[in-house]
Amino acid sequence: MQCTMLKAKLHQARVTHAELEYEGSCAIDGDLMDMAGILEYEQIQIYNIDNGERFETYAIRGEAGSKIISVNGAAAHKAQPGDRVIICAYANYTSAELINFKPSLIYMAEGNEVKGTSNAIPVQVA
């Protein structure tokens, strides 16, 4: 059996650029990609916290240390500079791989600084 699981998440990243005429994709600071384990050209989903848009594209490496999150091409209609987004990558895992599975969760602060990391989402309480 295979299960599709959350592999990596950049939580509450800020969009720094929206480039409609760029070829497409989402440029992510290379350091953030490495920290999260997101690969260049990997399929990602982006959830816009500010306007509710949800869309799919692929990641490209942005300049390391730049804090760039650039939503490009047609997706630029769905996010604007300053919007808070959640960027997720998913992967398929076998039952054996799930035994030790842990996602990579990166929590962002203002200016796309990393404020924390985790490998588990806390239990939601009523």
Curated annotation (Swiss-Prot):
Pfam families: Asp_decarbox. It is an enzyme of class 4 (lyase). InterPro entries: Asp_de-COase-like_dom_sf (IPR009010), Asp_decarbox (IPR003190). Binds 1 pyruvoyl group covalently per subunit. It catalyses: L-aspartate + H(+) = beta-alanine + CO2. Substrate binds at residues 57, 73-75. It is found in: Cytoplasm. The modification Pyruvic acid (Ser) is found at residue 25. It comes from the Bacteria. GO terms for molecular function: aspartate 1-decarboxylase activity. Is synthesized initially as an inactive proenzyme, which is activated by self-cleavage at a specific serine bond to produce a beta-subunit with a hydroxyl group at its C-terminus and an alpha-subunit with a pyruvoyl group at its N-terminus. Keywords: Autocatalytic cleavage, Cytoplasm, Decarboxylase, Lyase, Pantothenate biosynthesis, Pyruvate, Schiff base, Zymogen. Pathway: Cofactor biosynthesis; (R)-pantothenate biosynthesis; beta-alanine from L-aspartate: step 1/1. One of its GO terms (biological process) is pantothenate biosynthetic process. The active site is at 25 (schiff-base intermediate with substrate), 58 (proton donor). GO terms for cellular component: cytosol. Its cofactor is pyruvate. CDD domains: Asp_decarbox. Its EC number is 4.1.1.11. Catalyzes the pyruvoyl-dependent decarboxylation of aspartate to produce beta-alanine. Heterooctamer of four alpha and four beta subunits. Belongs to the PanD family. This is Aspartate 1-decarboxylase. The lineage of its organism: Bacteria, Pseudomonadati, Pseudomonadota, Gammaproteobacteria, Oceanospirillales.
